Amino acid sequence: MELEQQMNRRKFLSTATSTLGALGIPARHAAASEPTPTTPEQHPSRPNVLILMSDQHKRSCMGVAGDPIAATPNLDRLARESVRFTDAYCTNPVCAPSRASILTGLYSHHLESRGNSKPFAPKHKTIADHFNRAGYLTAMIGKMHFVDAQTHGFNYKLEFNDWWQYLGPKAQLYADELGRPNSGAGMPQIDTLWENNDPWSGLRRPDGRLSSVAVGRASEIAEADHFDNFVARESIRFLEDYARPNEPFLLISSFLKPHDPFMPAQRFAEMFHPEQMQLSPTWGKADLEHLPAEVRTSIRDCRWTPELKIAAEARKRMAFYYGCLAQMDDCAGQVLNALARLGLDRNTIVVYTSDHGEMLGDLGLWNKFEFYEGSCGVPLSIKVPGHAPAECSAPVSLVSLTATLAELSAVPLVAPVDGKSFAHLARDPASPLPHGPVFAEYALGEPEAKYMIREGDYKYTYWVHDIAELYDLRNDPRETTNLAARPEYRATVERLQRALFAWHRPAELAAESVHTTSPPAT
């Protein structure tokens, strides 16, 4: 059986290479890595795994989360069939570092992944490496922001460059549309498609400085040609062509939306109107005096898009965000429907999550980069066949997703991970087994470096060069009152800071340096 399975895998890789060639897609994207598999007899009912992933989805922007505007029927349906984790967090509120943690189960400081331009080293194993070794066929279709395209471990991979080639001459139209208001939202640097070989050309003022990102508008690109639609089609094709009994697969279908620029296809742009939008209750009401300087500056200047200080422009941006979200939901629904049509849903663990959130006007902030709930919180639904749906309010981290899925699939880990499995919660949210605090980090080694711990009702953020933040999420879910400087919370601050430093002590600090509300003396 092992020999037969290896032959089937070789047949797949050969077929994939031929198919890619017919599409005009380079064969190098079907990586011919030959794992040493376990046999199906060892795990006759080993489940498939499908991970649906989006980019910049604010956790609260779902119908199932109580948002009256969000058009997310497919993700809502999945959430109602799953254990929905209401308090899930990313490890780093920016694309590439967060995705690296999801893929590897390691924190950013171990990966040395400091931003969108630094790849993690090939020595780090990914979720694909673990599942490959267990005999799974592993595929990644869509955005993963690898930076270095070889550090992934997947047998089969289609991403931005493959989509560009699918677009053919229309790629220039998309590059022009994207280049006017934004850098490319994590697109590969195909320099010849950008004006003056500059992916930031749409943001350049005459003096060379960067200007603002556009508020949003309807895309000029046909709906079928959008990246998310490409991801949905290719994911369905993978399921139709390569899903086999007793040959389990791990498929990550990773969508770009609702990441900015907020340019949904025409019909989704028309679904929402600025007049419908309700600005965040904290928009324009932040308590600036008790916030770190970096946050105050972002609120005051409305970084990248100063127009958003105007209520009408803020509502317009929200409408286009919801349009992008609706388009992504539609694409995710196509994949889920195909899974059911093919009868694969009965033995497939299905996950939905996002790499980080979007502030969407909370506290007057937009985009990501923050540890506030809108930015660092992520949606997370895990559907395990045979287990009842429920909600789970225990804080969990995406760094633990690899370990969790490995345990749920009886897949041995081939390398250590930082994340601790919460499979017990995915099976039974009422499980009495403990699951530790959640940690996050941002801008390692930079002046704005900060670290976060969420434990119980409290979230504590340590800024290396600024004042600390402490929020009681039970009584202050919108994070309007920073408690860190209040004497009655000193013990709470010190307890959380000790736990945070036990997890990771920033290199910028002296060994004995501990502070509560202000940076250490220099």
What are the residue ranges of the model-derived segments?
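Formylglycine-dependent sulfatase
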Residues: E2-W463, A468, P477-R505, A511, ...
